[in-house]
Structure formats: C-alpha cells, structure tokens
C-alpha cells in the first residue's frame, strides 16, 4: 500500500481562489504580540498568473469573532503593510505571510483581489 506523505490528521486546507490557483494553509505562528498566518499560493495552470492584493481587502477574524487588523502582508519576495503583487509561476508554490495582532486561532480568513475574486478559509490553527 502507498502511504501518504502527511499523516491523516494533518489534512491540508486547500481552497481554489482563481481558476486553477489555490490557497493552501501552512501554519499559524505566534511571536511576541503578533501572529503570522503562513500560506502558499499554488498555480496549477500552464501560464503565469499575477496576484494583486491590498491589505484592506483581507479579513482575519479571530477565535473571539473579532476582526484582527492586518499589520503586514508578504507575497513571494514583496513585503508591505498596504499592497503586494506577485507573479505566480505554474507548479511553484509562492509563500504568503499575513501578520496580525496576536491570536489563538483564525475563525475566518478572507482574501479578495482587485478583481473581486474572494476565497475564504476557516478554522486555521
């Protein structure tokens, strides 16, 4: 029998955002008074895809149902507190890190690009 690389209980949260472009939850890390949501953007298309994000269009709801303000966003090598853009190359996962004030878990993470494409990930720990 073929064994999965990940244990059964470590099922990755992966959601399609754009046509053929997925958002994968990696981990939630806390350092001091900040938490970082680590994600991967994966393009399964044959062509490159540009992702353009404004921090005001990102929503993070904590375990208490409160919206956590976005401190900064990193997408690939771009890092900013307002807007990031990156070219997502096929089959090469691009790291995305969203920094927010400290939280225990993410009840809801909503990403919306400038074309109003929305993706929601829930229950991130």
Q: Which residues are covered by each model-predicted region?
A:
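Surface-exposed edge beta-strand/loop patches
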Residues: 2-18, 46, 51-65, 85-125
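Short, well-ordered beta-strand segments enriched in hydrophobic/aromatic residues
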Residues: 35-45
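Hydrophobic residues positioned within well-ordered beta-strands of beta-sheet architectures
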Residues: 23, 37, 94-96
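A generic structural signal for beta-strand entry/edge sites
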Residues: 32-36, 106
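Short beta-strand and strand-turn-strand segments in soluble, beta-rich domains
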Residues: 69-82
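Short amphipathic beta-strand and strand-loop transition segments with alternating hydrophobic
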Residues: 22-30
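Beta-strand-rich interaction surfaces with strong enrichment in secreted/lumenal proteins
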Residues: 26-27, 82-88
